[in-house]
């Protein structure tokens, strides 16, 4: 048979499309598999990263579909976002037109790969129907107290003119455009993810078997749970007066209450209210005020990597236990978003505090000593365990015991409380841009902030806008933002901020799980969600570990609590695929090392691209592009296709009734290679994900078949191999299966045959006093006595004239004779 990839691939892609071959059954009687690759942003062209992601997902979907599962394998488009606005400015196109033209082009590109998506469930997150249901969720979250509006210091991208969440910063720069981010005070909407911090942390335990440990660790660290003591520092009388009595105290949180007697200074974040007040009122010399202002302009993330710097605020607080005064500084290492933006500093037992104290010549008081009890002139902080010294009634107690005892003492005397803190911050979702989902709230002078009525949703974007790159066009639109208050009917204005695009990707998997026939009536069908959720296999890059993956977990829990789903975790299994490299670097236009998938498909065919992508490296590892390996993949498919000529009618008539016992040793070996590939297939798709080893096993099986002349073995071999390879090279396999088996080998799982794996003989090592001397070959059912007789004959020259003290037979492994002398 001649292999002409273009003709074969076009034929089967049209067949699959016309017959809706990959739509899931609406019946819920079968066991299901929900396979999902992270949906793409419609940037205009697919790249090799897309190809790898979607070929992996498609392999899973096809495997489980032919294994008689009801498979949901959808595709859609994460279509809101700043790149559309930037493209609108550059190409003078409306963002909507640019976006949907890209979707049309990329849809055709993905089709050319032969991906088995459910077409009926395709949507874009910029579709008004998707926006409608998302806005309903936002209103319900607002009513439940999960969404709120406040003014805060935010990360501002001067280039994109929008706010960024902490998770969207990369080394202090915008994750999208790379512009250095600045700090800015402005009002915005926040989603209370911190309300779910403990559940998000606890439920990582449920994922530890099937998620990469690196992702779990990243999320655990990002949530950042810590237990400790929260207490107040009272300002000294003189400091209260200096601050014009605007402040009398502030609160700090510490995970080391055992070191509280070693506090030698306190430090505040540059954004702390006291620091802001001092700057606003010019309560310090001009030089210090300028230095503080400069510190305030630097994002927290950047400050964390800078050299530790501080400024004496010339105020003092009282130690809560000793009553002694302690100087207060502003320091660049204190985070306003953690523990109230204030810390107690114990230089003797914290390396950061130690370095700061050394730099500014602040006192260092040791209050914990090691087992030797020696107090030394410290060159670094003592952070090991030990016993307390110079700590009043707690002196002599181990620091572990002291933590509990000091917290108890504070609580009993109402000085402070035991508290759990998290590094995780509430999620700021306001974005000052046009191409996003409008936030469905209205500002009324009389009623304040009012959600839009559910029956008025969606709040859709106006299309008559001009994108200039200067501010948000919704702010200046002549009519769109002007409306009436849903509560009192008076004149009001719409919120012009739009939602962070990570909101859309935080629930799209639940939308897919809803039968598309119900999309007009509900955003999420609970009945359908109960059947399809959780996603059985999710595929995407590890770069989403603390952005999309955390937000998706959070949103699922919120929607559960709001009654939309019973699911608590969205993704059972997670596979994070590695990057595709060329010349040792990530493909990029600037490096000139981009490989265009369209050109590869045009030259070799989609099956070759798929085979190379899945064979070149395990999916979780980086993949180095190799032109000669692509050629090799093409040659294998061509050989596999052409060798099918060896399958004749005689073999097709008889392969299902092969008598294994009547086969020659070579025939049995060839048949075993085929079934080993089938066994490997089941293992790869459920446990190891190592598609490369499966493909190698199929190549070995084909080589083994080539040595045979048994018609039935050839027919059975192709019956099984076309089934195994269908998830990887589907077009070629459907073509062969149709010609040879009328596609019947894709109906249900092919069962393993035990007789194929039955051992014909066993090789046993024969050892004398533990030293291997020879080997014997015996049948699997040979008795122990027969084995010993055969072993003695084989090792006679080493046993000659020796007294055998012991005879040991280890089944299926060895025979050992222990002899005297």
UniProtKB/Swiss-Prot annotation:
| Membrane keyword on record | no
Catalytic activity, per the record?
tRNA(Leu) + L-leucine + ATP = L-leucyl-tRNA(Leu) + AMP + diphosphate
Q: Which family does it belong to?
A: Belongs to the class-I aminoacyl-tRNA synthetase family.
Q: Which GO terms describe its molecular function?
A: aminoacyl-tRNA deacylase activity; ATP binding; leucine-tRNA ligase activity
Source organism superkingdom: Bacteria
As annotated in the record, motif 'HIGH' region runs over 40-50
Q: What is the lineage of its organism?
A: Bacteria, Pseudomonadati, Campylobacterota, Epsilonproteobacteria, Campylobacterales
Q: Where do the TM regions start and end? A: none
Give the UniProt entry's GO cellular component terms: cytosol
What is the official name of this protein in its record? Leucine--tRNA ligase
UniProt subcellular location: Cytoplasm
């Amino acid at each position: 048979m001649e292999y002409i990839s273009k003709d074969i691939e076009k034929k089967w892609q049209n067949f699959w499309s016309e017959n809706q071959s990959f739509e899931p059954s609406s019946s819920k009687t079968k066991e299901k598999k929900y396979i999902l690759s992270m949906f793409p942003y419609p940037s205009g062209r697919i790249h090799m990263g897309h190809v790898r992601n979607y070929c992996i997902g498609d392999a899973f979907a096809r495997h489980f579909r032919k294994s008689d599962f009801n498979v949901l394998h959808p595709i859609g488009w994460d279509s809101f976002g700043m790149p559309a606005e930037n493209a609108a400015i550059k190409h003078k196109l409306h963002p909507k037109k640019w976006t949907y033209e890209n979707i049309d082009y990329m849809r055709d590109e993905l089709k050319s790969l032969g991906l088995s998506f459910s077409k009926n469930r395709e949507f874009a997150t910029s579709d008004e129907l998707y926006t409608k249901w998302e806005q309903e969720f936002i209103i319900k979250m607002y009513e439940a107290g999960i969404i709120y509006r406040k003014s805060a210091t935010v990360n501002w991208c001067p280039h994109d003119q929008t706010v960024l969440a902490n998770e969207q910063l990369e080394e202090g720069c915008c994750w999208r455009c790379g512009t250095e981010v600045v700090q800015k005070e402005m009002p915005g909407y926040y989603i209370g993810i911190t309300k779910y911090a403990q559940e998000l942390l606890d439920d990582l335990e449920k994922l530890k078997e099937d998620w990469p440990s690196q992702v779990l660790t990243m999320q655990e660290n990002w949530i950042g749970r810590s237990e400790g003591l929260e207490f107040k520092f009272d300002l000294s009388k003189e400091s209260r007066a200096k601050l014009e009595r605007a402040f009398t105290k502030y609160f700090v949180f510490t995970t080391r209450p055992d070191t509280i007697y070693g506090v030698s200074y306190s430090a505040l974040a540059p954004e702390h209210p006291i620091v802001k007040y001092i700057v606003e009122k010019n309560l310090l010399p001009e030089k210090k005020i300028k230095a503080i202002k400069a510190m305030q302009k630097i994002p927290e993330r950047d400050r964390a990597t800078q050299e530790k710097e501080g400024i004496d605020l010339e105020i003092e607080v009282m130690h809560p236990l000793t009553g002694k005064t302690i100087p207060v500084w502003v320091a660049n290492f204190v985070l306003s978003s953690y523990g109230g933006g204030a810390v107690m500093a114990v230089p003797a037992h914290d390396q950061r505090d130690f370095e700061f104290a050394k730099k500014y010549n602040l006192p260092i008081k040791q209050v914990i000593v090691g087992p030797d009890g020696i107090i030394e002139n410290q060159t670094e902080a003592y952070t090991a365990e030990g016993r307390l010294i110079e700590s009043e009634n707690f002196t002599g107690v181990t620091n572990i015991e002291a933590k509990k005892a000091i917290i108890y003492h504070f609580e009993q005397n109402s000085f402070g409380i035991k508290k759990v803190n998290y590094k995780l911050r509430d999620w700021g979702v306001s974005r000052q841009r046009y191409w996003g989902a409008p936030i469905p709230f209205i500002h009324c002078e009389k009623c304040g902030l009012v959600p839009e009525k559910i029956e008025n949703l969606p709040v859709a974007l106006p299309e008559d806008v001009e994108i200039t790159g200067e501010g948000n066009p919704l702010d200046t639109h002549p009519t769109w933002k002007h409306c009436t208050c849903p509560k009192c009917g008076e004149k009001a204005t719409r919120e012009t901020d739009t939602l962070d695009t990570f909101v859309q990707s935080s629930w799209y998997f639940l939308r897919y799980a809803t039968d598309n026939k119900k999309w007009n009536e509900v955003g999420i069908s609970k009945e359908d969600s109960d059947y399809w959720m959780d996603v059985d296999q999710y595929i995407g890059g590890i770069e989403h570990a603390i952005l999309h993956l955390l937000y998706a977990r959070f949103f699922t829990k919120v929607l559960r609590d709001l009654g939309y789903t019973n699911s608590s975790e969205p993704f059972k299994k997670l596979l994070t695929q590695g990057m595709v490299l060329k010349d040792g670097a990530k493909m990029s236009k600037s490096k000139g090392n981009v490989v265009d998938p369209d050109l590869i498909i045009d030259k070799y065919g989609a099956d070759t691209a798929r085979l190379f992508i899945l064979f070149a490296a395990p999916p979780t590892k980086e993949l180095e592009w190799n032109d000669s390996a692509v050629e090799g993949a093409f040659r294998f498919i061509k050989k596999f296709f052409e060798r099918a000529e060896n399958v004749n009618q005689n073999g097709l008539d008889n392969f299902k009734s092969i008598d294994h016992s009547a086969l020659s040793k070579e025939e049995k070996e060839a048949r075993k290679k085929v079934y080993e590939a089938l066994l490997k297939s089941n293992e790869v798709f459920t446990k190891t994900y190592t598609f490369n080893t499966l493909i190698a096993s199929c190549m070995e099986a084909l080589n083994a078949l080539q040595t045979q002349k048994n018609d039935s073995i050839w027919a059975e071999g192709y019956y099984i191999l076309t089934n195994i390879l269908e998830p990887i090279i589907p077009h070629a396999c459907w073509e062969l299966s149709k010609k040879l088996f009328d596609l019947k080998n894709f109906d249900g799982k092919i069962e393993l045959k035990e007789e194929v794996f039955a051992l014909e003989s066993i090789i046993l090592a024969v050892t004398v006093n533990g030293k291997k001397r020879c080997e014997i070959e015996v049948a699997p059912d040979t008795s122990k006595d027969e084995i010993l007789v055969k072993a003695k004959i084989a090792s006679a020259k080493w046993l000659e004239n020796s007294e055998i003290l012991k005879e040991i037979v280890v089944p299926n492994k060895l025979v050992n004779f222990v002899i005297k002398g």
